[in-house]
UniProtKB/Swiss-Prot annotation:
Its main location: membrane. This is Endopolyphosphatase. Processing by proteases in the vacuole may be required for activation. GO terms for molecular function: endopolyphosphatase activity; exopolyphosphatase activity; phosphoric diester hydrolase activity. Its cofactor is a divalent metal cation. It is found in: Vacuole membrane. One of its GO terms (cellular component) is cytosol. It comes from Candida glabrata (strain ATCC 2001 / BCRC 20586 / JCM 3761 / NBRC 0622 / NRRL Y-65 / CBS 138) (Yeast). The chain crosses the membrane at residues 15-35. It holds the Pfam family Metallophos. Catalyzes the hydrolysis of inorganic polyphosphate (polyP) chains of many hundreds of phosphate residues into shorter lengths. The gene is PPN1.
Length: 663
């Protein structure tokens, strides 16, 4: 039988087309399976909110910028959520179940009859008294947030210290009490921000990102690399806040991150206790055995992935990353990570110090310090002795840092002298003409020893980051919380469908599975334990085999533009509103209402209130926006104008009029 060549050709073409369709279909199915294998990777449709339910007058009364929210729809589940371009930062609540109103402040408000007029523990607490927060103060603060802010914010940054200080020998703190109180606080917060009637305990209408404080551990300040009882217990307490795929990594280092806007914006909870000088288990961040070294590697892997996905991130933690608080090697390295990933990191949010202020960090000074350390003629023993002395001082300061403010004015004046005046000098000496820049290029490499090279304004902006330290709920001063506003006006210009760029990336499940293997390969089981590190091993800071120190980041690629903390764009911070509870007025009003015969419950609800203390737009130093350059110019203004500095200090101490005690 003769073969028809045309039929053969036709069948061949049909076969090819069929195989192409099969291949494309398979690719489509695989791609979709890959895309939706994790809840954190999916598309989000963006639309405007056409409802008339926006209460402009209420927003204005809260000091907020009046705006309509944006609606995002999860294309996988169909769930809708509103974005307001705002988030809440709350820290250091320090609730004290032993607080008794009417007792003696000298007895930390736990017992005893007052011996003088000002020695009496007030109903809502006394600013600057040294007592922790009454349970009532915490409850009323959370109740005020529930009634006034919950429906105005997109997420919550919660930076720890959810237990009283260990300042009463009659009632010594126990590990069980610490866990129990943290569980109680966590449940209160879950109740406020969870999606109503949802069967999923992880379904939050407003995502919450907690961090561990130095008083949330037992003994306070001391926290070792996991897995430990404490890391496991905090995962049990916070499991609903932490993405499931990060459980094993959290069990190791008590750090994690949450996509508060999936595929676009994250908040990273960084366990600052592994870099904290006052933690007896922290020697440095140079030894591979050290918790801080290992945590910085984790940070690097996560930031790389966030950068790869085109996302942006806020860093949050309890202890602020300033030289006073961190081991010098930890401070230097952490600051470098903040700088080299400035294309994705928006900023850092911290608590612990109970004062409302900011600290500029100059990466050029950091690099110079690291070079000087390498060139130092100090012997290894001398360096170790110096480190031990610094850590002992830090531990003593941390022990003294209870609720009562001590030498806070002196500290803040030190920030002015060390940081703000340094910024002023840099800005005043900045080279700004093309001729100056050309001369600078020609002189490059001829820098005289001890002489600081001048920079352009743009270089100064680029080489700084800002550490944001928030006021606290505990009445060290007046209780305070802060709402940040950020740019979502460009959100519809970005893409009508968020997450389109996420289609090509692996699920977070696979990423963290891979990361766990990488960390295990880097630090095998025998080496990962902090306790396995001998003193001799800890002293070896330099690698004899010449391998690069992975806890130091690579330089940011030049082609990557600066991120939302440096240039105004989507997610850039634009304004903040500082709220405070004026305890003198509140306690006085409560007493008056009780004297008039009002029931206690009614008097409490009528007397208590948070009000706007100030906003970043307020005189006498209104800020156009909250970029790094805006903070640097504010620092310079504060350094040159004593009148502005006095107002800044009054705000830093939350309108209490605090001054250091004079001898």
């Amino acid at each position: 039988m003769a073969v028809n060549e045309k039929d053969v050709g036709r069948k061949s073409r049909v076969s090819v087309v069929l195989w192409v369709f099969i291949a494309l279909g398979t690719l489509f199915l695989c791609k979709n399976a890959f895309t939706f294998s994790s809840e954190s990777i999916h598309g989000l449709k963006i639309s405007s909110d056409d409802s008339d339910s926006v209460d402009i007058e209420r927003q204005i009364s809260l000091g907020l910028t009046p705006r309509k929210p944006v609606v995002i729809t999860d294309l996988r589940t169909g769930n809708k959520r509103k974005l307001h371009g705002r988030f809440l930062h709350i820290t250091d609540m320090h609730p004290d179940e032993y607080y008794v109103a009417g007792t003696s402040i000298d007895n930390v408000c736990h017992s005893g009859e007052p011996t003088k007029g000002k020695d009496r523990a007030a109903k809502f607490g006394n600013a600057m008294s040294g007592c922790d927060s009454p349970m009532l103060l915490m409850d009323m603060t959370l109740d005020w947030i529930d009634k006034n802010l919950k429906d105005q914010i997109d997420f919550v940054v919660w930076t720890g210290d959810n237990i009283r200080h260990d300042n009463d020998r009659t009632y010594p703190r126990t590990e069980d009490e610490i866990f129990r109180m943290n569980a109680e606080v966590a449940e209160k917060i879950k109740k406020i921000f969870r999606t109503p009637n949802s069967p999923d305990p992880r379904d939050f209408a407003v995502p919450v990102v907690p961090s561990i404080g130095n008083n949330d551990v037992f003994p306070h300040n001391l926290f070792s690399l996991g897995p430990t009882l404490q890391t496991r217990e905090y995962y049990r307490l916070w499991g609903d806040f932490i993405p499931e795929e990060q459980q094993r990594m959290f069990d190791r280092d008590a750090s994690f991150f949450t996509e508060v806007i999936p595929g676009k914006l994250a908040v990273l909870s960084f366990n600052t206790l592994y870099l904290f000088k006052a933690n007896p288990l922290v020697d440095n961040c140079d030894s591979r055995k050290q918790p801080g070294y290992q945590l910085l590697l984790w940070l690097g892997y996560v930031l790389d992935e966030i950068r790869e996905r085109g996302m942006k991130v806020w860093i949050s933690g309890h202890v602020p990353p300033i030289a006073k608080n961190y081991d010098s090697s930890c401070y230097d390295k952490f600051s470098l990570w903040m700088h080299e990933y400035r294309d994705v990191i928006i900023g850092g949010l911290y608590g612990h110090m109970n004062m409302d202020h900011f600290v500029p960090v100059d990466v050029q000074a950091i690099r110079e310090n690291m070079e000087e350390q390498q060139m130092s003629l100090l012997s290894e023993d001398e360096r170790l002795t110096k480190t031990i002395r610094e850590h002992a001082i830090a531990a003593r300061e941390a022990h003294l840092m209870g609720a009562k403010p001590v030498n806070k004015e002196s500290y803040l004046d030190g920030v002015l002298d060390t940081y703000y005046k340094g910024v002023l000098q840099e800005i005043e000496q900045a080279v700004d003409s093309d001729l100056d820049i050309e001369k600078k290029k020609k002189k490059k490499g001829k820098k005289k020893k001890g002489k600081k090279e001048k920079r352009t304004l743009e270089e100064i902006y680029d080489q700084h980051s800002i550490v944001q330290v928030s006021g606290s709920v505990i009445p060290t001063f007046n209780p305070s919380i802060r709402v940040w506003e950020y740019n979502i006006s460009d959100i519809t210009d970005s893409s009508s469908i968020f997450g389109e760029n996420q289609l090509e990336y692996q699920s977070w499940d696979l990423f963290f599975e891979d990361l766990e293997h990488k960390m295990k390969n880097e630090f095998d089981d025998n080496e990962s334990s902090f306790w396995a590190a001998s003193a001799e091993q800890n002293k070896k800071k330099k690698k004899k085999n010449g391998k690069p120190d992975k806890s130091i980041p690579r330089k940011k690629p030049d082609e990557l533009p600066a991120g939302p903390g440096h240039i105004q764009q989507l997610f850039s911070p634009t304004k903040f509103v500082q709220y405070f509870a004026d305890l003198d007025s509140i306690n006085s009003e409560y007493e008056k209402l009780i004297d008039k015969g009002l029931a206690e419950h009614d008097a409490i609800n009528k007397a208590f209130n948070y009000e706007v203390e100030y906003t970043s737009k307020d005189e006498p130093y209104p800020m156009e926006s909250l970029l790094v350059k805006d903070y640097l110019h504010l620092a310079a203004d504060l350094a040159r104008d004593n009148g502005l500095w006095k107002i800044f200090k009054e705000r830093a101490f939350i309108s209490t009029g605090y001054e250091d005690e004079r001898n």
